[in-house]
Amino acid sequence: VPGPADEPTASQADPVEGVLFDIDDTLVDLEQAMGHVLQAIPDPALSHLGDDDWVRYKALYTTDPQRHYDRFLAGELTFEEQRVHRVRHARAGFTPEPFLGRVAEAWVRDYEQLLPQHFRAYDDVVPLLDALEARGIPYGAVSNNVHDYQRAKLDRAGLQRIGVLVGIDTVGVAKPDPAIYREGARLIGAAPSRTLYVGDNRLVDAVGARDAGLIGVWLDRTGAGRDRGVDSGTGAATGAEGVPEVPCIAGLAAVLQFLPSVR
């Protein structure tokens, strides 16, 4: 994993003039929110699960190893259907009970009602936004979900100040298509080559943004060194071989290292 020595500095010919962020598991702790809700929804078929079982169950849902979210991005599933497929796969490892019909419909209703109650911004988000504003650096978000859903998520997480938001329905494509990153740069008024894009998915966020002409930075909060299935995008590679290295940071405070020095 690249370290600080691999990161650009303010001495570069083209200093950063704008910053874009992924949302899920970058600005908003979606994995924790989903974990809370998965265990909160009453499900008699899972009443026998112990603590370790719940950890594995949640991981099967949040990491989406069968890539059902990609099928949603490709138009093969609705947003609700990809959730049903993911929870069905997770449940299959712990119960033979079917997850169909009214059972699935009731689960989706409960999930949709409960999830927004748990949207929280990471502790390092607001301090970074304060610092960007103090420096006059514009910022925004580019997400692999629809605009209105993500707008509501940001607002619920207390991030109303993020005014620029590009969703997959904004330009009709998903990450890693170059158009979605470039639209974000356009909306914040920054040249792509001078725009930092920060996200938790190494391939879809950091490499995708870099390939679109931005400065891609991988946010690896856990140090796990794995690609996130939750925000995997259509066209993303599944393996690590042959993937170019990109700058890596462990928290958002490190974004300031990429910005011009305050004089």
Region locations from a protein language model:
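A metal-dependent, Asp-based hydrolase signature
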Residues: T63-D110
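A generic alpha-helix surface/boundary motif
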Residues: H36, A40, E81-R88, D148, ...
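A ubiquitous structural signal for well-ordered alpha-helices
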Residues: V37, I41, Y57-L60, D64, ...
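Active-site neighborhood of HAD-like aspartate-dependent phosphohydrolases
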Residues: P2-T63
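Asp-based, Mg2+/Mn2+-dependent phosphohydrolase catalytic module
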Residues: V1-V19, E31-Q32, V126, D130-E133, ...
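Surface-exposed cleft-lining segments at the edges of enzyme active sites
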Residues: Y111-Q117
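Short, surface-exposed acidic
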Residues: L46-A59, G93-R109, R161-I162
